[in-house]
Amino acid sequence: MNMIQNILRVILGSKFERDLKKLVPIVGQINSLEKEMKETSDSLLSSQTQKFRERIARGESLDSILPEAFATVREVSLRTMGMRHFDVQMMGGIALHRGNIAEMKTGEGKTLTSTLAVYLNSLAGKGVHVVTVNDYLAKRDANWMKPIYDFLGISVGVIQHDMDHEQRKIAYSADITYGTNNEFGFDYLRDNMVSHKDHKVQRSHFFAIVDEVDSILIDEARTPLIISGSSDETTDKYVRINKIIPKLVAIEDFEVDEKARNVLLSEKGVSHVEEILGIENLYAPENVDLVHHVHQALKAHKIFQKDVDYVVQNGEVIIVDEFTGRLMAGRRYSDGLHQALEAKESVTIAKESQTLASITFQNYFRMYDKLAGMTGTADTEAEEFRKIYDLDVIVIPPNVSVRRKDSPDRVYRTEKEKFDAILAEIRELQSKKQPVLVGTISIEKSEILSKMLSSAGIQHNVLNAKFHEREAEIVANAGKPGAVTIATNMAGRGTDIVLGGAQLYKENLETWKDDDDLVRRFKESILKQELDNAELLIREMDSSVKQKRASEILESVKIWKKNHEDVLVAGGLHILGTERHEARRIDNQLRGRSGRQGDPGSSRFYLSLQDDLMRIFGSDRISGLMKWANMPEGQEIESKMVSNAIARAQKRVEGHNFDIRKHLLEYDDVMNRQRIVIYKMRNEVLENEDISSLILSFIEEAVENQIVAHCEGNNPSSWNLDSLKEWLEGLELNLEINEEDFKKTKNPQLALFEKVNAAAKQKYEDRAESIGKDIWKLLERNIFLDILDHRWKEHLYSMDHLREGIWTVGYSERNPLVEYKLQGFRMFDVAIENLKNEVVNFLFRVEVSENSKLPEERREYKKVGQEVTGGFQELSSGTPSPTVTVTTSSGGGTERKTSRRRKR
């Protein structure tokens, strides 16, 4: 296979070369328009948007106007922000517009690149979503690029976590909407829980650009978005189960699989658990929940580590994002795992949750007509992007060649030897004033290293989840001469480290609102680094206040420039990795913090055979080699065999994680098909004021099912008419049925069906007439939605339990996924049938009181249930719905009550 690929590469060129050949001619067309755009007045340039929209309305495609639209954005960006898109950014914009992932290195200007495709696609008028990893970046990027969009008459909205319904609706109605993957996903789920179509906030899913696409579509794809409500189950079981875990013996009672992050009970362990709990059979059907909780408690104790996977703060277990190192306050693991951790840490245990709505990021983002993404590191996951999302990765060349020097890994036998070598390296770097960014993969390791540096008298900053509020300040100082910064996972940080430290003078210039000619020229001189000219302009200023402020800015620039030059001489920012991450691209993201925009830089990773990656996935041969070589303590090894073993280990982990994500998707695809049916049915009810045809089809189906169940065949003598009459009485439908009436008919069963169906339909129409058409229409829609939501909630609960226990079929050599599909679809069919029957039964019995009025539509917005992101939860309140006073017959009497959408 490799030989064939090599031959094709020689004949056709590499994929990178082929991709560039397609992009270069279009960039040429854009560049040919630059002179014309420069000569265009502001008013004519801003009117381009209207002209483009008129051309699209006449049938012209977005592709045909791309060169002009991109050239327009480039010129507007230059006029409003002083930033001109490079040719490589044009290539990135084309790749995004075509629905690809643009891989662009750190510092290449992905945010500015996105404006090209965002503007072009916004012209279609269907809304463009720009997806970021956190609220801060969504707001920052929207505000940063807003001058371009404002000039062109394009509206911009930003979704933030604490926004209410009206604010969200306004943001989504804009041409461009910035927000996080979580907010977009949860808004979609909430839109499918509303009681009126006007309560929805999202429009169509037309085009989305996902920033840090690998972080969102790969790293966060293993766990779903869930909206949940609290369960009625007690928390006592978690305390009870937690007490037995310390009594179990490793290897004897259970085996820890670190590769799969799982714990397996042995047969002896099962017997031991049964003995401690005083039960006969742990795997009896009534103990399915017990098995699940024992398993989760074992994982909590043996897999999940404090200060690595979570921290305990103020009596709460708070999750640490494994990819960004940030605390995820308010988020909870699902499936009882968070409660197991709370029991382990002896803090207050919250009640377990019940799923009300859920979707994976894979299935959410696959809904978009066109999807694109940006990142600095996607090529290593190209296969997964192609197979799961049908996205091609286009590698965009850097505007300036990368000058960073990446040195080979240094490998040591023990972690202590590795840390000693790291300490010596940091000392040497600091002595020559070279800033160093030290990357760790956990809070625990960052704190160990911090203590070592403090003991050695080395000043440093620590950036991990515990110091999250100081992130901006720490990153701003990380590029100063001799700065030492320890960071836990730099993925999704979204901030560049500037050599010499942050250019604080730029912020000072922006906040200086004086706009006379001298001040304006002074600002231009500072930005162009023409410091001598800036000094002359200060002397010409007519105000001592202005002179003082300008002098302070100039001094700030001189200090930064000196620091910048010192760092350049020292070799730029040095990246020191203390451990390899499971995924190669996370290592590449850390490396990518250095050498931005042609800056000098360097990187090296320090490893030990005791690192998790090497210990769990590495080869025993490496350890054997080092022992055989009788290496002295502290001696490093640099060898091709070791490097290859590390690469193989990372590929194995990446493959394993891909399988987990694929496995999750296969299970969610079962739910997704069912979700599509339910949401489609729900939307039909929301979109149509009159759903009588749907209800009549339910009535017909209910009648048919009852006749098939009680009156099978064409022999009236064998029919169970008493059961059929009992069902009809339940619907308050008094219908004379005698078997003699049907014996002489050609098709007795069909005749019976036609008679009962006609009577049922007439009863339905009579009720609508007597109650009043307007109230009846509203009533049946509200009742339908109430029952639909209730049945869907119960079905999700059943599916959760099915999935928890489905793995046991593996013991009988059946495929758990196949069984899950079969049983899941059977359960779904039953749920749909129950839904239809319940709607019919309720509508035939409900009565509206004389004094009831048409309910007013409520437009207030409240979050429903709890949001669970990536298996993490957030508590919120229920949404009230319109009320109608009704009377429901029950046996011989009546019961007056208020029909209100049930709180979940």
From Swiss-Prot:
Residue numbers binding ATP: Q89, G107, E108, G109, K110, T111, D496
Reactions catalysed, as given in the entry: ATP + H2O + cellular proteinSide 1 = ADP + phosphate + cellular proteinSide 2
Protein name in the entry: Protein translocase subunit SecA
Swiss-Prot/TrEMBL GO biological process terms: intracellular protein transmembrane transport; protein import; protein targeting; protein transport by the Sec complex
Upper lineage: Bacteria, Pseudomonadati, Spirochaetota, Spirochaetia, Leptospirales
InterPro entries, per the entry: Helicase_ATP-bd (IPR014001), P-loop_NTPase (IPR027417), SecA (IPR000185), SecA_CS (IPR020937), SecA_DEAD (IPR011115), SecA_motor_DEAD (IPR014018), SecA_preprotein_X-link_dom (IPR011130), SecA_SF2_C (IPR044722)
Gene: secA
Low complexity bias locations: 876-889
Residue ranges of the TM segments: none
